[in-house]
Amino acid sequence: MVNFNQFLKQAQSMQKKMQEAQEQMVNARYTGKAGGRLVEITITGRSEVEKVSIDESLLKAEEKEMLEDLIKVAFNDAKQKCDEDSQNSLSGALNGINLPPGFKMPF
């Protein structure tokens, strides 16, 4: 049987580590690139676009469709980096915590 006081201490420790991981994520920045860096998008840990950089060669009417595709690819690249870092941070926060059998985390 799991000692309730021990479980409570582990839960408090886990909560503190998760808060720290979330704070780090808020301050993190992720840059996605597309088209050999013709388009770069930087997002925050909250997936908010912070900066968009577009090479001048793409600012022509005939390049509109390619530019739209590159923006999409660059954003998705940055978002994937953010998601991977978020998952790694939360996994690290839970490292060493012994959860009772059947206990599932909400992520």
Swiss-Prot record:
Primary localization class, coarse: cytoplasm
Keyword annotations: Cytoplasm, DNA-binding
Pfam family, one: YbaB_DNA_bd
GO MF annotations, alphabetized: DNA binding
Record-level GO cellular component terms: bacterial nucleoid; cytosol
InterPro entries tied to this protein: YbaB-like_sf, YbaB/EbfC
Xref: SUPFAM superfamilies: YbaB-like (SSF82607)
Superkingdom field: Bacteria
Cellular localization per UniProt: Cytoplasm, Nucleoid
Oligomer and partners: Homodimer.
Role noted for this protein: Binds to DNA and alters its conformation. May be involved in regulation of gene expression, nucleoid organization and DNA protection.
Recorded family membership: Belongs to the YbaB/EbfC family.
Name of this protein: Nucleoid-associated protein A1E_05550
Organism per entry: Rickettsia canadensis (strain McKiel)
